[in-house]
């Protein structure tokens, strides 16, 4: 979100550009046209400014001219149709299978909370569900024999997500222990519970798994979306089509899933560079 200080900085930079661009000591704002604003945007890119920062500065200029137009200081807004440079989405970070196996195979003897954490991790990896979806799961939403879980995504949209044998095994073992620690006076029946026997909070999942990752896979930097990206990437690596991955992730449109196709392109590029004689 823009602050007054940021607007002031952006407009000061635009003013400096106008002085240099026109070669005048004073520039009439009514003389600024669309081409001038385009050159301003181009000058920012030439200076190495990111697409995001360039877009923000252009937004400041557009707002400034909207204000001038509203108060009749100019006859038109020369920036209104100037487009900001496209922001290239960064490739999602994901875990290598070996790192994940290292964490999941770590000893959890005499520590039910660690076993719960590893079950959560296994379910994250096996389903690609969001953190909010995971903590909202009730025991009745899990069908271990069918290897499916009912989750409620964005906007309360319900979907059935399959999970694998390892997740089913981990869930079966966890449920036996859960019944020992669950709070007896709960109104609902949460799948994952805290140390107090209540529905586990989102922040507890994040902090517990971050601690686990920091101790066993330094540098991996756990986030719930890291597991979501890992789930999608490993599926695509093993031949899943992008539309199936979209449905499993609960994306409303294919555009949200398209970023993973860039990963596939990067992979193909590396294979080419390693294998082709003229690479």
Mark where each language-model region is.
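Conserved catalytic core of the tyrosine transesterase superfamily
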Residues: 1-279
């Amino acid at each position: 979100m823009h602050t007054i200080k940021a607007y002031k900085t952006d407009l000061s930079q635009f003013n400096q550009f106008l002085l240099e661009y026109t070669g005048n000591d004073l520039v009439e704002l009514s003389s600024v046209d669309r081409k001038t604003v385009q050159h301003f945007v181009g000058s920012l890119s030439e200076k190495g400014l990111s697409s995001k920062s360039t877009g923000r500065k252009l937004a400041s200029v557009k707002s400034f001219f909207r204000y001038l137009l509203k108060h009749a200081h100019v006859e038109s807004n020369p920036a209104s149709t100037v487009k900001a440079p496209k922001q290239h989405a960064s490739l999602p970070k994901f875990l290598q299978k070996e790192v994940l196996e290292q964490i999941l195979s770590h000893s959890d003897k005499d520590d039910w909370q660690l076993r719960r954490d590893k079950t959560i991790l296994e379910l994250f990896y096996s389903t690609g569900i969001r953190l909010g979806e995971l903590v909202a799961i009730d025991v009745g939403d899990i069908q271990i024999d069918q290897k499916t879980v009912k989750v409620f995504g964005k906007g309360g949209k319900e979907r059935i997500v399959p999970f694998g044998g390892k997740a089913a095994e981990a869930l079966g073992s966890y449920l036996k222990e859960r019944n020992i620690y669950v709070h007896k006076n709960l109104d609902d029946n949460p799948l994952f519970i805290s140390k107090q026997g209540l529905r586990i909070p989102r922040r507890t999942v994040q902090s517990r798994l971050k601690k686990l990752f920091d101790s066993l896979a330094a540098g991996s930097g756990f986030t719930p979306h890291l597991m979501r990206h890992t789930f999608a990437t490993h599926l695509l690596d093993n031949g899943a089509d992008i539309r199936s991955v979209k449905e499993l992730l609960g994306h409303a449109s294919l555009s949200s899933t398209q970023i993973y196709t860039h990963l596939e392109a990067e992979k193909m590029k590396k294979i080419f560079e390693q294998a082709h004689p003229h690479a």
